[in-house]
Amino acid sequence: MSQFTHLHLHTEYSLLDGANKLKELALTLKEQGATSVAMTDHGNMFGAIDFYQTMKAQGLKPIIGIEAYLHNHDELDDKSSRQRFHLCLYAKNEIGYQNLMYLSSQSYIKGLYYYPRINKKLLEDYSEGLICSSACLQGEVNWHLNTYSERNVRFGAKGYEAAKEAALWYKKVFKDDFYFEIMRHGIGDQRMIDDDIIRLSKELNIKIIATNDTHYTFKERAAAHEVFMCIAMGKKLNDPDRMRHSVHEFYVKSPEQMSELFADIPEAIENTQEIAQKCNLELNLGNPTPPNFKFTREYAKDHNIILPEETKEFSFDNDDMVFEELCKKGLEERLKFIDESKHEEYKQRLEVEINIIKNMKFSGYMLIVHDFIKVAKDKGIPVGPGRGSAAGSLVSYCLRITDLDPIPYSLLFERFLNPERVSMPDIDVDFCQDRRAEVIDYVIDKYGADKVAQVITFGKLLAKGVIRDVARVCDMSIQDADELAKLVPEELKITLDAAYEKEPKIKEFIDRHPKGLEVWEYARALEGLNRNAGMHAAGVVISNESLWKKTPLFRQSKNDERHLVTQYSKDHLEDVDLIKFDFLGLKTLTVINNAIKLIKKRYNKDIIWETIDVNDSKVYKTIQSGNTLGIFQIESGGMQSLNARLKPERFEDIIAVLALYRPGPMESGMLDDFIDRKHGLKSIEYPFDSLEKVLEPTYGVIVYQEQVMQIVQIIGGFSLGGADVVRRAMGKKDPEKMKKLKTDFADGAEKQGYDRAKAEDLWELIVKFAGYGFNKSHSAAYALITFQTAYLKTYYPSEFMAALLTSEENNVDKIAVYIDEMKKMNIKLLPPSINKAIREFSALEQDGKDAIIYGLGAIKSVGIPAVENLLEARQDGEFKDINDFLGKIDPTKINRRTLESLIKAGAFDEFGFTRKALFDNMENLSEASRKMAEVRKNAASSLFGEEELTSGVQVNFTPKNEEFEVMEKLGYEKEILGIYVSGHPLDRFYEQINAIDYVKSLDFESLKNNGEILSIGKIEDFKSMMSKNNKRYGRIEILDYYSSFDATVFESNVEEIENIIKDENLKNNAYGFVLGFKAEGGEKPSFFLKAIKDLQSLEDGEIKAIKKFGAKKDFKNKEENHFTAEPKEFEKNIIELDLTRLNRELIYEIHEIARNAHNPNEKNNKKLVLKVISAGSCLLYHTDFIISDSIVEEISNKYA
């Protein structure tokens, strides 16, 4: 068998060009008998570690290389020309690998101009340990030789002598490590220069290598690769002007095929093996070293600590000394809020944790995290109380990395760091979303831009996305592409093949659609490939030395040299000796911070969380009520229902709620079991009495991973470190390991005097629950944020809601939801006020009631500079009138457009003018503002004061007192504020609408599958269109009390809609819209209009054939309970029931009372209707029972 090594190969990391999937590639090469292979991705090393490990796993020698872009200018960042050449570089050894990383990094940091480029000066300086080849037709030598190309000649190709000169330069730099490449794909220009390359080879004594420009693994993938390129270029496959390959030879050819192609120059094949033998890079992966804290000496000086190695900048001993001192000082501060009788327990635990962290050499890591969190807090940047397993560490609490005391909640340090299984610490930190970047910038400033980088992430062509991309390229309609994509089940990481097996409708679509099979097969071929490179939302790495020595770097923007990004993804950072820190953005922290500021401003009161009881009963009444909108983690409809059922009474209950509200615990029955035990419907039992303390907080149910660890420790006699190893093994479900651990557990239990058989039964129970167990440390830390938001909503509702509105000021739909909540809370929303409003939404009292005033910063076309100028002008007191306002502002910042927006928003209402009067005098207002500004400018040289001079300039008002029509006034509010504030277009129909059961737009997210609903609103807009079949259809925009939404209108309703919108009075009426909907696979529901009804025609919210959503399974068996969802005409008795309080037993009791009282012959009896309320929605169920008013009253008193 011929020996040949592919040395010109593009993996899936040559974004939207290379389609070689690494695992598939490795298996193919192994089958072909290859022993080595190179990667030469375009301009990057993104896939180097992935490539290295994947090839090694199949017994292949990986050669890490790159196809670089080279320009011939003296300065690396020269942008005078876009001309660049290709060049292949291969790392022979560790030095070559280091130089390759540096070259790749510099190509992005300094050389980025359309492409990441290097120049010859840089290449020469960092050429050691590298092999170089002349690359493809775009290589400098080949480009000069190819004078057959008119384009080359036009841009300066000079033929053989110029090629020779270039080759001599490369030979001078790389000596015998420079090679000519010859490719034989059948491309005309390549064939024409072969002889010249061979001639140059002989003349200059430079060896030739045979290469194949490999972009995909199998020959039959050529067409899919064309589709791939179309995705990259935004072209369609049938576009005659798109770039396309003239041949389809860019696949992984076997050694035999390559030998046959180069039979005339067999040495070109042999030379590939020569390069392979020269490349002997062995990477030492998987031994990450935690970074030292660079500024230990400064901290020591500030805290009067004498360091053991005072002269060293980086020292583990120094880190240990400062770390221990800060921990102990931190504990002293924390103990001020802890009962003195427990102090010794805290000191002993801290000592244990400190010693473990020092032994694992993580002191510097902890100091780095402590430092950037401290700085963030000092700058007033909100920081979360903790997240993840770090919340189980007392050290974290003492260093104020977290703000949750782990001891009262039995949080385990070993869940964070296990001394028996060394792994890197992983502390994720939540910061205010708006100011997270400031913390990252602080770290960059402190450690240096070359030592800090964010982490790369790759967008992939996943199942739904690749279907849509391929469908566009293949010219399939958007609607059809959407239909096919939505058939893919909503499962994380599902593949197209798995989707095909699970969803029979996919095959039906493929069979009936003319392009179905083509799109599907291309999508399968391209699925999983990288689409683009981006930046990880949170990941940051910090290094003691320049990062390019561990990972090549890149940057996303050509204008941002400061914020660098690793070329290696998060999965490979530890492999190259780097530890990731996660700087996460959490909007809720900003809400809490803003609410606290508003409380301070209004009541002059500080909120000190350490002094507030986390078991405050009033707060838990709020949570139990289900009115949890805006409360962290528990505001969804499902969570509202759960809290109404569970009725949390203590902080431990919130921790459990956050851990249990997940598919696993809910589907397994754990959640129901937990609730039943809490309410005494099931007895609380413990497998052994010794486990009562561990399981009491969760009523005997194993909810947390920490409980698994404690059970293994107490019963099996394991250390907590050993128990953590057991927990991890349970997660991986290794049968052999599990069998041994079960024996160890039973042996340990028996040794401690426990019944072996009972212990083995307990092991099986643990294994079952371990699959659903949640990290209590994380749940507890987030439960603290839940409690804080619930506390603020309970005691300071106006300030909390104002902060919520500010956090969503650009999300009109969310603001509408919060305004609806404010109505329920009896808090009024006021329009912006020129004298009362600030940048954010704020709380105040009006007529003895709480109100929230619209924030100036949320007004469209006003902008922050205008707001700042307005607030500055108001510093000495409120504006007396419109002239006073105009006399103090800067007209360059508050210009005519800004004034117009403020008028439309109602900000000047308090000055006594109508909005229309101000609007009609806009020219006069602008002119007066400009003149007053000129007067102020000249006041310095005047004998008169500024106020005296400006008072001489007045607005020349055209006297008008009429106001805009109501709908026009509201329209302007909607235009400028995004919502209606002073009223709503549907207000005149409020009584009628309120009497009707309908689905609100804010409940649309609860819609599942397909069905029909009734919506109430007015028509905002309608667009008519013509289909391919020459049928009229359109899109209608409907406005209800909460937001606007679209629905498709088919031909049968188009004329009716057009007649309505032609008549202004009809258009402004409210209607009932019978809407069909599709909400499959977790997608947002799409609507289509079925009928329009006058409000008068809606009798108590009933329309035949309209079915409400969310039916509970208890009602589905008509034969069993006589309930039916089919509406009929009848006199009725309606009983309202809360769905969250219903269970099968209660339904049976109601059923029995109604059945026994059923008497259709009694004249005054009426049909029983159950009105079931759930999370804002309402369902009517019509029974077959005819009963009296007195029986209805009995049921209502007992169950309603």
Swiss-Prot record:
It catalyses: DNA(n) + a 2'-deoxyribonucleoside 5'-triphosphate = DNA(n+1) + diphosphate. It is found in: Cytoplasm. One of its GO terms (biological process) is DNA replication. Its EC number is 2.7.7.7. The gene is dnaE. This is DNA polymerase III subunit alpha. CDD domains: DnaE_OBF (cd04485), PHP_PolIIIA_DnaE3 (cd12113). Its main location: cytoplasm. DNA polymerase III is a complex, multichain enzyme responsible for most of the replicative synthesis in bacteria. This DNA polymerase also exhibits 3' to 5' exonuclease activity. The alpha chain is the DNA polymerase. GO terms for cellular component: cytoplasm. InterPro entries: DNA_pol3_alpha_NTPase_dom (IPR011708), DNA_pol3_alpha_thumb_dom (IPR041931), DNA_pol3_finger (IPR040982), DnaE2/DnaE/PolC (IPR004805), DNAPol_HHH (IPR029460), PHP_dom (IPR004013), Pol/His_phosphatase_N (IPR003141), Pol/histidinol_Pase-like (IPR016195). It is an enzyme of class 2 (transferase). DNA polymerase III contains a core (composed of alpha, epsilon and theta chains) that associates with a tau subunit. This core dimerizes to form the PolIII' complex. PolIII' associates with the gamma complex (composed of gamma, delta, delta', psi and chi chains) and with the beta chain to form the complete DNA polymerase III complex. Keywords: Cytoplasm, DNA replication, DNA-directed DNA polymerase, Nucleotidyltransferase, Transferase. GO terms for molecular function: 3'-5' exonuclease activity; DNA-directed DNA polymerase activity. Belongs to the DNA polymerase type-C family. DnaE subfamily. SUPFAM superfamilies: PHP domain-like. It comes from the Bacteria. It holds the Pfam family PHP.
